[in-house]
UniProtKB/Swiss-Prot annotation:
Compositional bias ranges of the Basic and acidic residues kind: 230-242
Protein task: One of the primary rRNA binding proteins. Required for association of the 30S and 50S subunits to form the 70S ribosome, for tRNA binding and peptide bond formation. It has been suggested to have peptidyltransferase activity; this is somewhat controversial. Makes several contacts with the 16S rRNA in the 70S ribosome.
Higher taxonomy: Bacteria, Pseudomonadati, Pseudomonadota, Betaproteobacteria, Burkholderiales
Gene Ontology MF terms: rRNA binding; structural constituent of ribosome; transferase activity
Disordered as annotated region, ranges: 224-276
Family note: Belongs to the universal ribosomal protein uL2 family.
GO CC annotation, single: large ribosomal subunit
Pfam family, one: Ribosomal_L2_C
Protein name: Large ribosomal subunit protein uL2
Length: 276
């Protein structure tokens, strides 16, 4: 997919870089797989802000994406078209099964219209096919990896994402994630062969603040620009630094401080991710 720089007809378009994919469907999405999506603007049921820097943005439907792919084993399918999805960084593919049913799945790297796909333990080792990890060769690049069997893919789902199957030991397999973390998963969990497509998504330049507002992202104000009542970094005469270890608005250290508290799954992590 080529990157396109826009002509500098305005300050906002001067540095804008877009990812252009001529293979994407230019019409409307498949209506039976759409659901309404209501803007929460980062608020909970009491109207209190629980996630900062969210609000506004263009209204859009949710595309129902099949992350499980476990109830059509052995039924061949074909890629009908590739589509843009405003809810995720990756593109999605509309596939049609031999029995006529249509579903959305994340589009793998190199996926083309008309490509044949299959899921199940008998599926060939080919990009876009979904298999249990026990049937995938060691060393394969995979994406859309399940952590719990039957729950659906939870790992390596964003644009350009992937993982590597390192080994199988008994009922567990070891998978290395992009972060460098090595994690154990049950061999009954499923994964898709290949990488997630739209890998150039990280190279785009939005060009102007308004483009983020279209996406529902509000401005982020620095703590040192606030008052002491609003942030631990706030206050001071003139321009001042934090004067302490950088922390969040609630006092938690923000740079390199480990906040993981899920002891239940700690035993599944063989090697923690590398420090950057």
């Amino acid at each position: 997919m080529p990157l396109m720089k826009t002509k500098p007809t305005s300050p906002g378009r001067r540095s804008m870089v877009k990812v252009v994919n001529p293979d994407l469907h230019k019409g409307k999405p498949f209506a039976p797989l759409l659901e309404p999506q209501f803007q929460k603007a980062g608020r909970n049921n009491n109207g209190h802000i629980t996630t900062r820097h969210k609000g506004g943005g263009h209204k859009h439907h949710y595309r129902v994406v099949d992350f499980k792919r476990n109830d059509k084993d052995g039924i061949p399918a074909k890629v009908e078209r590739l589509e843009y999805d405003p809810n995720r960084s990756a593109n999605i593919a509309l596939i049609v099964f031999a029995d006529g049913e249509r579903r959305y799945i994340p589009a793998a790297k190199g996926m083309t219209v008309g490509q044949s796909l299959m899921s199940g333990s008998e599926a060939p080792i080919k990009s876009g096919n979904n298999l249990p990890i026990r049937n995938i060769p060691v060393g394969s690049t995979i994406h859309c990896v399940e952590i719990m069997p039957g729950k659906g893919a939870q790992v390596a789902r964003s644009a350009g994402g992937s993982a590597v199957l390192l080994a199988r030991e008994g009922v567990y397999a070891q998978v290395r994630l992009r972060s460098g973390e090595v994690r154990r998963v049950l061999i009954e969990c499923r994964a898709t062969i290949g990488e997630v497509g739209n890998e150039e998504h990280s190279l785009r330049v939005i060009g102007k603040a308004g483009a983020n507002r279209w996406r529902g992202i509000r401005p982020t104000v620095r703590g040192v620009a606030m008052n002491p009542v609003d942030h631990p970094h706030g206050g001071g005469e003139g321009k001042t630094g934090e004067g302490r270890v950088p922390v969040s608005p609630w006092g938690t250290p923000t740079k390199g401080y480990r906040t993981r508290r899920n002891k239940r799954t700690t035993s599944m992590i063989v090697q923690r991710r590398q420090k950057r």
